[in-house]
């Protein structure tokens, strides 16, 4: 069942999803693939990693905890099940080329129809047995799944039929998460920013793709009752794999206005690793002001990224406090919150080269989460002590000049 947002001046904070897998788990996965260990031994390694993750999350004081996707191969592959090739899935075209030169591919559906063979709710249910704390769960987007089938479809299985199946599956995935005990769910939408990057090495990408992605996500959200939709977020970032991004060079000014056409309950927006984090808050504030003036729908909450998962440099609680207080110049405090820029390791096998090892990266991740939690508390206290007067819906234009709403 979804959790209520904090009241008063308290700013919400939550993780995105993934955390670095311990090196022992990464080795166990590789050993299992070549038959060196049994499925039962792999399950024990996964269970140990999940228990450690939940325990260390609790130590940070985080209001919501997560299993850090310790059981997943990647953020995008879990719907394919544990034996995707048995379900007619094969390696497809390039999904993204990262700044360090490595790439990831899109799974390609060899035959229809498409059906979910694994559910995010399975992870929620397992974690629910291990903790009584509120759980956060990340899920795949319909737009990511849409890349598995070409425009011409697969023989008698048309692309329109495929997209109908994707939408139905994604909506069911979210409903199951809440039924299993998740308090909030967010849709990973890393392909949103990447869609605006024209790259011949990733042939699916291009600005024309973004509109179709947004339509698909809205179709999924429309399948959910209002009380659940309010607890469903959409996360955007420029990617994070092996401490490298895939679309950090894409101007946020191109994405943010389009992003807020998605009718989600809240958004998680990467910001800390931007060259100018204030520009992100300013762009977001302008969109919130537009929504308020148009009366189209209630303005959503926005959780800004205040930690950079690609860097081992630790943010302090005081730095995070200052970032949030500064962001409140542009985003109403009652709609503001914090998160991490991205999942810390969206793919299971991740050497975390800038950190030196996945184990050290794991320690760094929990230290960053603890700083985020404490920094958000400090920002809440400081903002609570300020008088907002009649301008609680502070909107600032691109010039930085305050705009008072009528």
Q: Which sequence ranges carry the predicted segments?
A:
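Domain-level signal for soluble alpha/beta catalytic cores
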Residues: 1-406
């Amino acid at each position: 069942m979804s959790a209520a947002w904090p009241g008063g001046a308290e700013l919400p904070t939550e993780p995105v999803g993934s955390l670095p897998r311990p090196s022992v788990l990464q080795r166990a996965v590789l050993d299992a693939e070549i038959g060196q260990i049994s499925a039962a031994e792999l399950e024990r390694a996964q269970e140990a990693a999940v228990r450690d993750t939940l325990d260390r999350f609790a130590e940070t004081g985080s209001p919501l905890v997560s299993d850090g996707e310790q059981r997943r191969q990647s953020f995008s592959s879990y719907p394919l099940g544990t034996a995707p090739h048995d379900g007619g899935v094969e390696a497809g075209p390039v999904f993204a080329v990262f700044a360090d030169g490595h790439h990831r591919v899109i799974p390609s559906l060899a035959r229809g129809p498409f059906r979910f063979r694994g559910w995010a709710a399975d992870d929620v249910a397992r974690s629910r047995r291990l903790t009584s704390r509120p759980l956060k769960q990340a899920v795949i987007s319909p737009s990511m799944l849409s890349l598995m089938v070409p425009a011409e479809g697969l023989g008698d299985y048309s692309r329109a039929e495929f997209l109908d199946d994707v939408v139905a599956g994604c909506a069911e995935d979210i409903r199951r998460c809440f039924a299993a005990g998740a308090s909030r769910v967010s849709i990973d939408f890393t392909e949103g920013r990447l869609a605006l990057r024209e790259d011949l090495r990733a042939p699916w990408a291009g600005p024309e793709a973004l509109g179709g992605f947004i339509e698909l996500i809205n179709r999924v959200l429309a399948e959910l009752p209002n009380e659940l939709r309010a607890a469903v977020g959409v996360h955007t970032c420029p990617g994070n794999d092996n401490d490298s991004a895939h679309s950090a060079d894409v101007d946020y000014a191109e994405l943010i206005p389009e992003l807020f056409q998605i009718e989600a309950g809240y958004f998680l927006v990467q910001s800390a690793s931007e060259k100018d984090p204030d520009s992100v808050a300013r762009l977001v504030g302008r969109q919130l002001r537009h929504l308020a003036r148009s009366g189209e729908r209630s303005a959503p909450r926005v959780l800004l990224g205040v930690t950079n998962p690609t860097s081992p440099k630790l943010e302090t609680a005081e730095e995070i406090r200052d970032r949030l207080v500064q962001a409140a110049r542009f985003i109403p405090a009652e709609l503001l919150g914090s998160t991490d820029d991205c999942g810390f390791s969206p793919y299971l096998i991740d050497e975390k080269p800038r950190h030196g090892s996945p184990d050290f990266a794991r320690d760094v991740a929990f230290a960053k989460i603890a700083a985020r939690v404490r920094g958000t508390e400090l920002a809440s206290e400081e903002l609570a002590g300020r008088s907002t007067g009649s301008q609680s819906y502070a909107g600032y234009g691109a010039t930085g000049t305050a705009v008072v709403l009528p």
